[in-house]
Amino acid sequence: MLRIADRDFHSRLFIGSGKYSSADIMQKSLAASGSELVTLALKRVELERPTDDIVTPIQNLGLQLLPNTSGAKTAQDAIFAARLAREALGTHWLKLEIHPDPNYLLPDPIETLKAAETLVKEGFTVLPYCGADPVLCKRLEEVGCAAVMPLGAPIGSNQGLLTRDFLRIIIEQASLPVIVDAGIGAPSHAVEAMEMGADAVLVNTAIATANDPVAMSKTFRDAVIVGRQAFEAGLSQNASLKASASSPLTEFLESL
């Protein structure tokens, strides 16, 4: 069981709602994934009619909505978007995203920290998307964020955990949930993140753009479960180039 702020989650797989070919495919994929939390770009919601064909399928599944501030370039932009999201969707949960660079969509650490501090004070449950920077993640924890969401690789790149060494440090130091976000392009990437001790992963592109998004959702569901089980079982730390026989015959042969 994973607890974030005031909610418990059985599933450690969180899903993004973008890039699906239709609302129907999205809904079926979400159901197949077993996920209980879905991110939603505020720019895709009609604020005058928030119960449109994007929001309704998610609400019908009883999932936790996590609106994000994708498109915000400054802390001020993100704070404004967050207030709109709370008003339109009736949730204080927020994925904080600030990325001024349109090419790589890398998060701005300074603006993210600034916005997080303000939004926490305003009563938001803030989950910031951030670089895999252990110092920044600790600062975000200190200002009261409910979790941190460091990237594995640039958004939508499907490159896997390019930041694995820094993710390990973040996980080791954190006293709050660590959700690996961005760059997870295959179920094996999700397994790796969970094996190293991440509390959850967020996946969008790898599922939504798969040939069969519903089947891929199921595969990611299973991958996250297996990765977490491996972590809890305790992975062997005896990684070495030198061989080590599992059943050495030395003493047996010497006794003959």
Curated annotation (Swiss-Prot):
Keyword Glycoprotein in record: no
Disulfide topology: none
Subcellular location: Cytoplasm
GO biological process: thiamine diphosphate biosynthetic process
Keywords: Cytoplasm, Schiff base, Thiamine biosynthesis, Transferase
Entry annotation: catalytic residues: K95 (schiff-base intermediate with dxp)
Pathway: Cofactor biosynthesis; thiamine diphosphate biosynthesis
Pfam (any one): ThiG
Catalytic activity: [ThiS sulfur-carrier protein]-C-terminal-Gly-aminoethanethioate + 2-iminoacetate + 1-deoxy-D-xylulose 5-phosphate = [ThiS sulfur-carrier protein]-C-terminal Gly-Gly + 2-[(2R,5Z)-2-carboxy-4-methylthiazol-5(2H)-ylidene]ethyl phosphate + 2 H2O + H(+)
Family annotation (Gene3D superfamilies): Aldolase class I
Role according to the record: Catalyzes the rearrangement of 1-deoxy-D-xylulose 5-phosphate (DXP) to produce the thiazole phosphate moiety of thiamine. Sulfur is provided by the thiocarboxylate moiety of the carrier protein ThiS. In vitro, sulfur can be provided by H(2)S.
Subunit organization: Homotetramer. Forms heterodimers with either ThiH or ThiS.
The protein, known as: Thiazole synthase
Organism: Idiomarina loihiensis (strain ATCC BAA-735 / DSM 15497 / L2-TR)
Taxonomic path: Bacteria, Pseudomonadati, Pseudomonadota, Gammaproteobacteria, Alteromonadales
Gene that this sequence comes from: thiG
